[in-house]
């Protein structure tokens, strides 16, 4: 599945792994993925989240409050939580529904929103974001912008 990721989506995944290791977490959870999407900075997901008033510092603070810190890890965690794996599956499905043959940051965010019960969704709600409303707004936006040929895996 990673082979279909855009450069920005791969970068967001890398940031997710880095923040998990920095926080001393031995896994990559949806909360780390949310942080990575925002930290990436220029993808559709980052722009949407920034438009909702989110910052990487706000997400980091929420992660620390909800989960805490462990010992900083020298190696990046390899394991994705089952919920994060589910989010990736949902991201792929949402991309296909829209007619995209790649996974961009926008699809990763849609996967988080679609899954609906993760730590990432709790963080969004704690920061005043309505995940269901955001999901529907994003789907509408992406359907309006969906290229007929399925898009390019280098853009988002």
Which role fits each region the language model picked out?
Residues 1-156:
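Histone-fold recognition with a strong bias for associated Lys/Arg-rich disordered tails
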